[in-house]
Structures are given as C-alpha cells and as structure tokens.
C-alpha cells in the first residue's frame, strides 16, 4: 500500500481504510477579526473531548483559491474525523473577506489572526495545514507559534509559481531547517509547482520529526487522488499526533 524509501513514502492509489473517530455535520459560518478587516470563515465542529484544534489554509486567491477548494475540504475532513474542530477562512480580499490581496505578506498575518481565534475559542494544542499558497504563507508563522504542535504542507510550492506579477515567484522555506515540530509534507508525484527533486532536497534539510508522502499519478491539485490525500493525512495524524500525544501522557511529559 505504502512504499517506503527512508522517510519518504510513495502511495500508488490503494486504500488505507482507517476508522474515523468523529465527523461533524455541524458547520458554523461567521467572520473573524483580521488585521485588514473581517475574514470570512467556516468552522466544522469538533467532539466535546477534542484533543486538538486545526486550521486549513487555501491556495492562491488570484487563481480562484478559496476556503471551498476541494483539497482544503478533504484535508479538513481528514482532521475533523478525529474530533478536532477545524477552521477554514478566506484570506484578505478572497471571497467576501475584507481587505485586498497582499502578495503573501499580509496573508501571513491573517494566519496569525486565525490561530489566535482558534486558541481563544478552544484552548487546545493546534495543527496547521495549508495547501499550496496556504502552505507557503502559513508554515512560517505556524513554526514560530508555540501553540501549534504539528504542521501539514499539502502541495508545498517549492518550485517557481506564476503569481500576480510578470515574474514567477519562488517561495522560500529556509525557516523549516529550524522547525522541530511534527511535520507532514504530502504532494503529488507529478506536482507541477513542487518538483519532486526540489521537494526531496528541502525535506532532507528539515529536522525530525518529519514525513514526506508522494502520491503517484497525482498533480498539484490531486485530481482523481483526493481520497488518497485524505487517507494520507488521517494516517499521519493517527501516528504522529494521536499516538505521540498518548505516549507523552503515559510518560508524564505532557
């Protein structure tokens, strides 16, 4: 099902069939206060005994990215299946959020505002997940935030990306070299914005604990591979977040 090469896994489209603990049908629609105005948000409710809370950030808004993106939705469903309350929001200028697109700079502040809201609402350890642009702007502030315990980069854009300028933008991820939190990177093996060689080179420089999963046959948008994406996130959460937290509780380190 999963082929291992060091810490890198390659999936070939077979089902993991993990049992979910909880999946909420309760969705709260609201606005949270951001640094550039109100941010449109959705919260999928968690279980009463939730152990973590999570936020999932969407891809580039100038190319149609919103909180309703399919990859964002499936990532949310994976996290919510463990009973975690999961927040999605539209960056400034996207959807009906206030403000204007800020080329990734102000959007990092939006991530901080979302983390603050999530912390104030639930007072739980947090998990950050971001897809594409969402990963590019959200991983840095999440690495620096002690309240965030685990990170998920989906389709992390390590290659040049045509953005809102004439020159394609290359995002930098050097900060990950100092990030010792639990980390999952999951991408399509044919990701046109995250070339495999560059992603593996970055992964080699990132400290443990970490995991890289490449889904065979998948492109940047995981077309036809969304189930595998969801199952990959579920498997990692079960292994790296749930089991790890339980072990720490038993040892008294939490």
Residues of each region from the PLM?
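Gly/Ala-rich beta-loop-alpha elbow adjacent to hydrolase catalytic centers
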Residues: 130-138
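Short beta-strand/loop motif that positions the catalytic acidic residue
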Residues: 179, 185-187, 191
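Catalytic histidine neighborhood in serine/cysteine hydrolases
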Residues: 205-221
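N-terminal cap/lid segment of alpha/beta-hydrolase-fold proteins
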Residues: 2, 12-49
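Alpha/beta-hydrolase active-site loop
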Residues: 101-121
